Amino acid sequence: MAVYAAVFSPTGTSRKGAWAMASALGEARLLDVTLSPAAAQVFSREDLVVFGAPVYGGRVFAGALERLSPLRGQETPCIATVTYGNRDFDDALLELTDFCRERGFVPLAGAALVGEHTYGSIQVGRPTAEDLEQDRAFALEAWDDWNAGWEGFSPPGNRPYREGGKGGSFVPSTLENCTRCGLCRDQCPMGAIGEDCTSIDSSRCISCFRCVKRCPVKAKGCFTPEYESFAQAFSQRLKEPRENQYFLPR
């Protein structure tokens, strides 16, 4: 059996949970579509794919689905995972499960995982070691169910899906201590950062804050009063930790 983790994960949070599950089931291979679309690939029934993507406004980020779209299954078992920043995952897990089914995969289980939110100080450090251990145990249980003949699970959510799946509205800016090393420019999922490493195209930026998280000199960030006010209130509203939710076919 070949095991894969197929992920879109700008700050690495969605990747952690999906990778924990995939690696628990065997020697896993990472298919990271954060910076570019997946190459066309067809998987067999003997393979297993763990999909991982972030929740944006209660939906899977639309760009993640676009980049995962070249992957196709042939009755290939998969686990669908979405990661959200402690507010809610709404219709995202249902949406990702539908997406997988439409492309020939058989979702055997799904999970809504809590991760550190992009904005403010919300669930900092998640997923924790305990979260990842839960992920690994869930993957093993899901695989046992599949081998026992259980198929299909019912993720929560509604059709039609709620509005969402787009980027946020807070565009980072660049401080004067920027060294123009090019890391943020080369690592931007949407190619929104200019050649000068300081200018950011607001029409392309999805507010994933990958540049903010990765800048070695902390020159990227949102420094406006509007953002600071929002982040403080949002962090207070979501301070109580939520638990990961796992869905099996029984």
Question: Positions of the model-derived regions?
Answer:
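FMN-binding flavodoxin-like domain, especially the glycine-rich phosphate-binding loop
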Residues: 2-17, 21-169, 224-250
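Iron-sulfur cluster-binding cysteine motifs and their immediate structural context
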Residues: 174, 179, 183-206, 210-227
